Swiss-Prot record:
Gene: plsY
Localisation: Cell inner membrane
Assembly information from the UniProt record: Probably interacts with PlsX.
GO cellular-component term (any): plasma membrane
Protein's UniProt keywords contain Nucleotide-binding: no
Annotated SMART domains: G3P_acyltransf
Biological processes, Gene Ontology terms: phospholipid biosynthetic process
Organism, as annotated: Chlorobium chlorochromatii (strain CaD3)
Protein name per its UniProtKB record: Glycerol-3-phosphate acyltransferase
Bilayer-spanning residue ranges: 4-24, 56-76, 90-110, 122-142, 152-172, 191-211
Keyword vocabulary terms for this entry: Cell inner membrane, Cell membrane, Lipid biosynthesis, Lipid metabolism, Membrane, Phospholipid biosynthesis, Phospholipid metabolism, Transferase, Transmembrane, Transmembrane helix
The family this protein is said to belong to: Belongs to the PlsY family.
Membrane topology: Multi-pass membrane protein
Catalyzed reactions: an acyl phosphate + sn-glycerol 3-phosphate = a 1-acyl-sn-glycero-3-phosphate + phosphate
Length: 234
């Protein structure tokens, strides 16, 4: 029990690192929450700090999710405080990753006012199901390129994830042959691509949550007032 608690606490602290706030303070001496949408996430960093900084912030937030779902769990597997949790591996990684997402949204380092958790959730899922997430990232990037709305891309990518897992698992069984190449590079633990049913359930919950956290963006999209990002600045 103590080991599970430690995993959740450390993952929360990792997720709580306020990347966009640090970038805003370092680059412009501002609190990014006072500008744009008022959110401390990657989307607002794109708007306020430019696409290069926004991309950097997003990548770091993604890494936070990967670290929580993979590295934190791996560390405590080899250095448990008491008995290592006897639960489904994917479920454990999801718990650690979600703790990081909660940390990102309710960061202890910034008055519990953080981002929306999209990038950190994406990082968590990259650590668990990298092949499926490559497809989801493709959906995200294509949508950003076409629409110039990161919010739209985030929503569509969230919806795409459980659909892709379900299609791969129950219709095509894509990616099963990857194990040979994974073992060849001796990286099966890190890059193991799961199609566990927990991911479908979790993906549906996350999709609903992301749609809910983007409700203000959806209102602005319907009103035609949602800001677009530009690839020609900064």
């Amino acid at each position: 029990m103590l080991t599970l608690l430690a995993i959740l606490v450390v993952s929360y602290i990792v997720g709580s690192i306020p990347t966009s706030l640090i970038a805003g303070k370092m680059l412009k001496s501002i609190d990014i929450r006072d500008f744009g949408s008022g959110n401390a996430g990657g989307t607002n960093a794109f708007r306020v700090l430019g696409w290069k900084t926004g991309l950097t912030v997003t990548l770091i937030d993604i890494i936070k999710g990967v670290v929580a779902a993979v590295s934190v769990v791996a560390f405590f597997r080899h250095h448990p405080i008491d008995v290592f949790p006897d639960i489904n591996e994917v479920a454990l990684r999801l718990l650690a990753g979600m703790s990081a997402v909660i940390g990102h949204v309710f960061t202890v380092f910034a008055g519990f006012r953080g981002g929306k958790g999209v990038s950190t959730a994406a990082g968590m899922l990259i650590g668990i199901a990298p092949v499926s997430m490559l497809m989801v990232i493709g959906v995200f990037l294509l949508t950003v390129y076409i629409s110039r709305h990161v919010s739209v891309a985030s929503i569509l990518a969230a919806i795409a994830f459980p659909l892709i897992i379900a299609i791969r698992k129950y219709l095509f069984e894509l990616g099963a042959g990857l194990d040979y190449y994974i073992k060849l590079f001796n990286a099966k633990f890190f890059f193991h691509d799961s199609l566990d049913y927990h991911l479908i359930i979790f993906g549906l919950i996350v999709a609903i949550a992301i749609i809910y956290t983007h409700r203000a963006n959806i209102k602005r999209l319907l009103a035609g007032t949602e800001n677009r990002i530009s690839f020609g600045k900064h």
